[in-house]
């Protein structure tokens, strides 16, 4: 732990609590990182992190998801591809409680019915979500963003009186290293590049040690180098977390799957194909609806 990290850890919470409130990020953001009491602990004994069974979502009669079934195993890195409008983001909306399906079930582990939980409860039992646009607190430093994401209790009282423990500082340092921002810990998040902001947001999600991470087009707008580093980051997370990565960038998907992982192709709200990237790329129906556009 470097001295300036320690110093940053001692920053009075009330100083940046005010900044958080003035920050340009959405009000629900801090809440989404918050831990909440939940009805029970997820049971992962069977190695399944998430199970969607025949999930249907209709918008004015249009089926954005059409009897979608999908299983994500514990520690698995699963790439999901599909043309615009295939239902990829809607699927994440359903898993995180933002959208309620008309039909079907969504089970976390083998026992938690996610359809019965609210968005903040779902975030609190280990499901983190990264939206396409980075949503970090621009006026806070990188360190402060991670510190805030780490706090279980964000009430003003807790913010005023709590001090970071050695273990908490170690966790922040570990995540800073992982997301390539150790040297930028004291920089205001608003000054980071687009790619660095994306990494910071991923780091903020990791502070909560999520079991399942949902990442919607995480490398959109990144440089080639940033994209490659992001793939390395995700590969290093594989096994420790389940990752569901929605992406259009096939070179990135190729790097993530390393020629040996299953890719899921969504089309019109259902699974069109599943297999190695090379297999789905050679699948005529996939070529027709997606790759051949
Ligand atoms: N709130 C909504 N109201 C009405 N229609 C919606 C709503 N959300 C999504 N849709 C429609 O549902 C379909 C699936 O959208 P979704 O955003 O899930 O697709 P996607 O696979 O994420 O596409 P993209 O690759 O462009 O991000 C689209 O036709 C979209 O217009
Ligand atoms: Mg989308």
Predicted regions and their residues:
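ABC-family P-loop ATPase nucleotide-binding domain
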Residues: 1-56, 293
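ABC ATPase NBD Q-loop/coupling interface
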Residues: 105-125, 162
């Amino acid at each position: 732990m470097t001295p300036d990290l320690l110093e940053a850890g001692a920053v009075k919470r009330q100083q940046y609590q005010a900044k958080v409130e003035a920050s340009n990020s959405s009000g629900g953001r801090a809440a989404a990182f918050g831990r909440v009491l939940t009805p029970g602990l997820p049971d992962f004994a069977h190695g399944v992190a998430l199970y969607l069974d025949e999930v249907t979502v209709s918008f004015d009669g249009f089926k954005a998801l059409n009897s979608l079934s999908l299983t994500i195993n514990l520690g698995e890195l699963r790439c999901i591809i599909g043309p615009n409008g295939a239902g990829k983001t809607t699927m994440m909306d359903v898993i995180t409680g933002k959208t309620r399906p008309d039909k079907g079930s969504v089970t976390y582990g083998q026992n938690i019915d996610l359809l019965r939980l609210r968005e903040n409860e779902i975030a609190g039992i280990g499901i983190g979500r990264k939206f396409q646009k980075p949503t970090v607190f621009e006026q806070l430093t990188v360190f402060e963003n991670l510190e805030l994401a780490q706090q279980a209790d964000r009430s003003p009282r807790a913010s005023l009186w709590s001090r970071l423990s050695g273990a908490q500082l170690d966790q922040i340092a570990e995540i800073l290293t992982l997301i390539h921002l150790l040297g930028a810990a004291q920089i205001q998040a608003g000054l980071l590049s687009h790619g660095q902001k994306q990494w910071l947001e991923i780091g903020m999600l990791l502070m909560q040690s999520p079991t399942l991470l949902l990442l919607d087009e995480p490398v959109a707008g990144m440089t080639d180098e940033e994209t490659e580093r992001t793939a390395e980051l995700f590969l290093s997370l594989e096994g420790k977390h389940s990752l569901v990565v929605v992406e259009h960038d096939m070179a990135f998907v190729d790097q993530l799957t390393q020629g040996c992982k299953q890719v899921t192709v969504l089309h019109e709200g259902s699974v069109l194909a599943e297999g190695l990237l090379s297999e789905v790329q050679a699948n005529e129906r996939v070529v027709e609806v997606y790759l051949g556009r």
